[in-house]
């Protein structure tokens, strides 16, 4: 069968949240990062097979990786026209976002699955204060993109959470 046009690569299996709606099997996996050499080899093979777009995320939080900007640049250098990323937003500081945009990130999506700080603390199962960090980081990303003149789409996604998703997924 032909290779898909777009592929997501999970650079890390680590996440700083513990969301109740996240895939239950995720919590059973080793929380490790992908080997850099393996990542580079994977990029070459995917490009050779005709993949056009690379997502540098899956279930883990890619902003935990110190080499995320280098991973984005490596994908662009390999010839991928579109490199995208989804984040929970809590760790994408202005400095990290700027580095990713400089590296060539084409799309940054924020997974904003919480209506307010209370729901955030309950669903993500982390400190309430991270909600404010997340909101500030979303606003900063737009400012950085606009001031730097970067061609990076900024998006948000939201799952309407009724409190039962976690139970239904078990």
Task: Write out the residue ranges for each language-model feature.
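Conserved alpha-helical substructure of the radical SAM core
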Residues: 1-107, 122-126, 132, 136
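Active-site loop signature of alpha/beta-hydrolase-fold enzymes
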Residues: 17, 115-117
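Histidine-centered beta-alpha loop that forms part of the nucleotide-sugar donor binding/catalytic region
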Residues: 58, 87-89, 112-115, 159-161
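Short, electropositive alpha-helical surface patch
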Residues: 72-75, 112, 161-170
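Conserved strand-turn element in the central/C-terminal portion of the radical SAM core barrel
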Residues: 83, 87, 137-168
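Internal catalytic or translocation cores that form aromatic/hydrophobic pockets or channels
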Residues: 107-110, 117, 156
